[in-house]
Amino acid sequence: GGLWEFPGGKVEAGESVAVALRRELHEELGIAVQTAEPWMHVRHAYADKTVLLDVWRVQSYDGEAQGREGQALAWVMPAALADWSFPAADRAIIDALTAVAAPSDHAAR
């Protein structure tokens, strides 16, 4: 408890990951995903279970995101995510987001 989490949930029987993404983001945030693509897979072993996370990039959606299940909602810049408390399984996602958002050493000067 008391940790921040990225929106998402479980894939239901007979449901594709893409359909689950759209359903979960509608249920949790009230948005209708228009375009999204798979981005990364995370496997994390806790002491009592192993979780597998399919992480997607949502490029466009309709609606205004709001916490529809009683949860708080915050838009956070990737560089600031390290200051927030997340479950251990989300660390790989935060590291990847931070790396993608960081300026490249090869950027034009």
Descriptions of predicted regions:
Residues T98-R109:
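Generic C-terminal helix-cap and adjacent flexible tail
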Residues V55-R57, A65-L97:
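NUDIX/MutT-family hydrolases
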Residues A32-V33, H41-A65, A72-A74:
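Active-site-adjacent beta-strand/loop module that shapes the phosphate/pyrophosphate-binding cleft
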Residues G1-E28, M40:
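Conserved Nudix-box catalytic region and its N-terminal flanking loop in Nudix hydrolases
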